[in-house]
């Protein structure tokens, strides 16, 4: 069975790009555009990997807050954080939260 990867990003083009690349490599992918849809997807079926954008415009929670909550519920769920606008402080926070 292929690994199930959940991709969370507010930009549809980025979600589709990452999903397409991973699907071409044989992975099963799902996408979410904000915190609410991400939590719904995770609770409906826990993914094998979470690819999570740090800045989610229009979302109730940003990627770091989603990471913190997800790791409190699913400690062993691997998470890869992505961002087009990262900085050292944000990267350190993501590592501290378990990414």
Question: Residue ranges of each PLM-predicted region?
Answer:
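His-Asp phosphorelay/catalytic-motif detector in bacterial-type signaling
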Residues: 2, 46-48, 72-78
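Conserved phosphotransfer microenvironments
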Residues: 35, 53-67
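Active-site beta3 strand of CheY-like receiver
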Residues: 45-56, 80
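Two-component/phosphorelay signaling modules centered on CheY-like receiver
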Residues: 3, 11-30
């Amino acid at each position: 069975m292929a690994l199930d990867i959940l991709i969370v990003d507010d930009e549809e083009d980025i979600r589709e790009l990452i999903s397409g690349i991973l699907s071409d490599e044989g992975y099963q992918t799902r996408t979410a555009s904000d915190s609410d849809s991400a939590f719904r997807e995770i609770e409906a079926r826990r993914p094998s990997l979470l690819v999570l954008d740090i800045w989610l415009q229009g979302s109730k929670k940003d990627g770091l807050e989603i990471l913190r909550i997800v790791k409190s519920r699913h400690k062993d769920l691997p998470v890869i954080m992505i961002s087009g606008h990262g900085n050292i402080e944000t990267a350190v926070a993501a590592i501290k939260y378990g990414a």
